[in-house]
From Swiss-Prot:
Record EC number: 3.5.1.56
Induction: By N,N-dimethylformamide.
Summary of subunit composition and partner proteins: Heterotetramer of two DmfA1 (alpha) and two DmfA2 (beta) subunits.
GO molecular function terms attached to this record: N,N-dimethylformamidase activity
Enzyme class, broadest EC rank: hydrolase
Gene3D superfamilies: 2.60.120.200
Function summary: Hydrolyzes N,N-dimethylformamide, and to a lesser extent N,N-dimethylacetamide and N,N-diethylacetamide. Has no activity against the substituted amides N-methylformamide, N-ethylformamide, N-ethylformamide and N-methylacetamide or the unsubstituted amides formamide, nicotinamide, acetoamide, benzamide, acetamide and acrylamide.
Protein name: N,N-dimethylformamidase beta subunit
Reaction it catalyzes: N,N-dimethylformamide + H2O = dimethylamine + formate
Keyword field: Hydrolase, Plasmid
Higher taxonomy: Bacteria, Pseudomonadati, Pseudomonadota, Alphaproteobacteria, Rhodobacterales
Pfam families xrefs: DMFA2_C
Length: 762
């Protein structure tokens, strides 16, 4: 097995001719050079039963050799408060107060609030070590004094913590008090927590100038020559309302702070209110406000969770917009990553006339290679074809660098077989801090990952990549469609779901027909609006997928490369904690479209019904397939033919994830049910959405909901919608050298939908 020695990413998902994309690359060493080459991606599946891998070299100004270098990644979330003037040095008496809720108190050293140079042991820091609070003072020579709490912190329990440096009394002290209410902590009022304490120690030194920024949720590694403070010892958990006072608080004042009061506001050097800025659209910013009036504002790094319940949350309000004073916490994780922040290696300005399509910058370093994918749009505001392929970029981000098969306890059970790992899986396991997590993973403290980013190497978003369950997924699977369109001579444009979110229905209206990829599971509310309006106004859609439009997502308005999802009960790897179902990036409730009265059936005709990853079935025709109104769809297919009984994904066209026709969930009543899939194993099961009381008989061998339905309905104003309801459908297009009834049916519908005339009426 080869090892990964080079990896990269680009700054944006898509661009039109005349626009620039920047590329960022890191190699294992800084020796030698690497080669870069622009390629058009055509077929990403190496399955020997298919046409094989296909790419096309495209000459570009960015092609060539570049010096190899290693680029460090800052991992973990924190807040940085620049302090070049030294105003937060606190070289006299000072006190630090914060509320904290630790999720991993026993996991090594973790900074809470600090102005500290760890290399020189200089400055001051409030931190956790071995499950206890530690307050440290270090002078310019590296001599340190510290005081350690004599009571350990309980996991997921809120505390009020005050650290005091008193140079007159030559003491340092810690005040620790639990502030548990009925809802804010793991335990309630009935638990007799023995964790309140005050401890002091003698201090013979005063804090030296660390020449670092003040950090919240970490420690400064060193005073960097380039002015950048690298954060180490990241904290896992929540911090609420940290404050820095320019005097030594008394024990009585320290304990009073546990009630949420502010001791002599005039004496504050800084007071960071993480809820400041919450408004009708959430708190879609990295800015952290200092409300002391001294202007020591901060910046979030690596997207800590915002809109999180604070120390005083009482459970009566679940929307942070309505009660910002109880949502003053940031939830930090040592394994957050919203941007690798590498230096640029090279860029490319897309030339006029470059075909709209799936592309990648292919980079090679010795025997190691990587592909950095992106999407070329048609010229802004124009269409160059009648067909639009909509790349499922929200779902690409949701699954970006997922580690389900080698980290999730249920991964093998869900797959129904032993996982098959490759070099990218091993690389993710060994060097996670290059890559970050997916929304199917949990942070190290167990919290589900709710933010995901494009600005990092995404190893499973590569042609040729195979998931741990043995087949291709997302972008490589969508290339089955691109290859088929090229093989059949169809002209098409490409856009992304991010582009649709920005441009709305106007983007779709430029085209006679819009095609999905294999798995458009994650969508914004605006994208659902655009699809519904497009179809209702006479547009034509082909949903060549399953499990589409299932989870609602939000895009960060200041960082469009960041996507947010907050999950509820359903087909999910995790559920958002109580009180945290609303997106920080737009203030709206997260969860499933179906849970917001918008089941996929209402727009695309079918919606998520079952999943399983051992093998795929095929379709048998239903009576509607012989309806004369469906003759144009079934042209060339005999009435008794099985549809899709071969393919590259699981061996058939009906598999992996399945959607069903369901009038009770909004399938239009004029819909034709053309075919339904069969031969699904017990690995396939009914989704939680359709289970009230679990009982035997919920699997593919027994339950009627375990099926995919091929449907067609016409809409008002000449529109039409065709749905195949299976993730593995596209994998059958090239089966038997493209000579099969999946290809034939898809071609029948696409050829009709391209025409400048209304879709056939039903």
């Amino acid at each position: 097995m080869k090892t990964v020695k080079i990896r990269g990413y680009c700054d944006r998902l898509s661009a039109a001719p005349g626009e620039t994309i920047r590329f960022y690359v890191s190699a294992d060493t800084s020796d030698g050079s690497y080669e870069a080459e622009l390629v058009r991606l055509i077929h990403g599946d190496t399955n020997p039963a298919g046409p094989g891998y296909k790419e096309e070299s495209v000459k570009s100004a960015a092609d060539g050799s570049y010096p190899a270098r290693f680029q460090r990644t800052q991992f973990g979330s924190f807040v940085e408060v620049p302090d070049a003037s030294g105003a937060l040095l606190a070289d006299g008496a000072f006190s630090v107060h914060t509320f904290l809720w630790s999720t991993t108190p026993g996991r090594g050293r973790q900074g809470l609030v600090s102005r500290w140079d760890d290399e020189r042991q200089c400055g001051w820091s409030l931190a956790i070590e071995e499950g206890r609070l530690v307050f440290t003072i270090g002078d310019e020579s590296g001599t340190t004094n510290r005081v350690i709490s004599d009571r350990p912190l309980f996991q997921e329990v809120w505390y009020s913590v005050t650290a005091v440096f008193d140079p007159v009394q030559k003491t340092i002290s810690l005040h620790q008090k639990s502030v548990v209410n009925r809802t804010n902590s793991r335990f309630g009022l009935v638990v007799p927590l023995d964790s309140d304490t005050t401890v002091s120690a003698v201090s013979q030194v005063s804090p030296g100038d660390s020449r670092t920024s003040l950090l919240i949720a970490g420690l400064g590694e060193a005073a960097a020559a380039d002015g950048r403070t690298w954060c180490i010892a990241n904290f896992n958990g929540k911090i609420d309302a940290p404050k820095l006072y320019g005097r030594a608080l008394s024990s009585e004042e320290a304990m009073k702070l546990a009630e949420g009061t502010v001791a002599e506001p005039w004496s504050r050097l800084a007071h960071w209110d993480f809820s400041a800025g919450i408004g009708p659209d959430g708190i879609p910013t990295d800015h952290v406000v200092d409300i002391s009036g001294n202007g020591h504002h901060g910046q979030c790094v690596n997207q800590p969770d915002r809109g999180s319940t604070g120390w005083n949350w009482d459970g009566h309000e679940e929307n942070f917009i309505h009660c910002p004073q109880q949502y003053g916490a940031l939830w930090f994780h040592e394994d957050c990553l919203d941007d690798c922040r590498w230096d640029k290696d090279f860029e490319i300005t897309l030339p006029d006339g470059l075909k709209s399509d799936f592309y990648a910058m292919k980079i090679r370093y010795g025997d190691s290679e990587d592909y950095i994918p992106f999407f070329v749009l048609p010229p802004r505001g124009k269409a160059t074809a009648k067909i639009l392929v909509l790349a499922s970029t929200f779902s690409y981000l949701a699954y970006a660098n997922e580690q389900i098969m080698h980290k999730a306890d249920i991964g093998q059970a869900v797959a129904g077989h032993t996982p098959v790992l490759n070099e990218n899986d091993v690389e993710l396991h060994r060097n996670l801090d290059y890559y970050g997590l997916s929304t199917y993973d949990g942070h190290v403290d167990g919290r589900g990952v709710q933010y995901t980013s494009w600005r990092r190497p995404i190893l499973n978003l590569r042609p040729k990549h195979r998931q741990g369950f043995g087949s291709i997924w997302e972008l490589p699977a969508d290339l089955h469609l691109i290859d088929w369109l090229n093989h059949n001579g169809f002209d098409y444009d490409v856009a992304t779901e991010h582009d649709l979110n920005e441009q709305g229905v106007d983007l779709l209206r430029r085209y006679n027909v819009v095609l999905t990829g294999s798995h458009p599971e994650y969508q914004t509310w605006a994208n659902a609006d655009a699809w519904e309006d497009y179809l209702a106004d006479g547009g034509r859609g082909m949903y060549l997928a399953a499990n589409g439009m299932y989870w609602i997502v939000s895009v960060h308005p200041e960082k469009p490369w960041v996507m947010e999802v907050r999950k509820e009960l359903g087909v999910t790897a995790w559920e958002a904690p109580p009180g945290e179902y609303h997106y920080s990036t737009n203030g709206r409730r997260g969860g499933r479209f179906r849970g917001r009265a918008r089941a996929t059936q209402k727009i695309w005709g079918t919606g998520m019904s079952s999943f399983g990853f051992d093998h795929s079935g095929y379709f048998v025709q239903m009576p509607d397939s012989q309806d004369k109104r469906a003759a144009w769809i079934m042209d060339g297919i005999d009435p008794d033919e099985r549809i899709g009984d071969g393919g590259l994904v699981g061996g058939g066209a009906g598999g992996y994830e399945l959607d069903r026709y369901d009038l009770s969930l909004g399938t239009p009543p004029n819909t034709l049910l053309l075919a339904s899939s069969v031969e699904h194993s017990v690995v396939y099961t009914v989704i939680p959405d359709d289970k009230s009381f679990p009982h035997p008989g919920m699997n593919g061998g027994e339950h009627p909901f375990v099926r995919a339905d091929i449907t067609y309905f016409s809409t008002a104003n000449g529109g039409g919608m065709f749905s195949t309801s299976s993730i593995s459908w596209l994998g059958s297009l090239s089966w038997n050298n493209y000579d099969n009834n999946v290809s034939r049916m898809t071609r029948n519908v696409l050829t009709q939908f391209m025409k400048d005339e209304p879709a056939p009426l039903v």
